[in-house]
Amino acid sequence: MWSDPIADMLTRIRNANMVFKEYTDIPASNLKRKICEILKREGFIADYKYIEDGKQGILRVYLKYKGGRKNRERVIHGIVRVSHAGRRVYVDKDHIPKVKNGLGIAILTTSKGVLTDKEARQLGVGGEVIAYVW
């Protein structure tokens, strides 16, 4: 049986977002923390914090919504895992994808760390496409 911690993280965020939860808890790792940092910097989540639990720790991700209580609208419209254990997706610097014609982001792991598609294009590096968020 395969387990994919990044897909699990994205699914937890997607599910919590669909029912307008205030936050969701995710088992922590360094890669997940970097992905949360990108989501926060790009404005897809309100915040996240690391909670020590004596084991690996927990990332509490605070979701972001537009509007008031009655007419609430999601900031994250879609979040999809691209590269997974059965099918790795790598791109070079000339073929970095644009998500929703630039309205979304692609998250990549590169030799320079975890970057968005825009940052990877600016630095001229390719890598493994982890996820699309729009």
From Swiss-Prot:
InterPro entries to which the protein is assigned, alphabetical: Ribosomal_uS8, Ribosomal_uS8_CS, Ribosomal_uS8_sf
Assembly: Part of the 30S ribosomal subunit. Contacts proteins S5 and S12.
PROSITE patterns: RIBOSOMAL_S8
Record Gene3D superfamilies: 3.30.1370.30, 3.30.1490.10
Protein family (similarity comment): Belongs to the universal ribosomal protein uS8 family.
Primary role: One of the primary rRNA binding proteins, it binds directly to 16S rRNA central domain where it helps coordinate assembly of the platform of the 30S subunit.
Single GO BP term: translation
Annotated TM spans: none
Biological classification of the source: Bacteria, Thermotogati, Thermotogota, Thermotogae, Thermotogales
GO molecular function, one term: structural constituent of ribosome
GO cellular component: ribonucleoprotein complex; ribosome
Organism encoding this protein: Thermotoga neapolitana (strain ATCC 49049 / DSM 4359 / NBRC 107923 / NS-E)
Source superkingdom: Bacteria
Keyword Mitochondrion: no
UniProt keywords, alphabetically: Ribonucleoprotein, Ribosomal protein, RNA-binding, rRNA-binding
Protein name: Small ribosomal subunit protein uS8
Name of the coding gene: rpsH
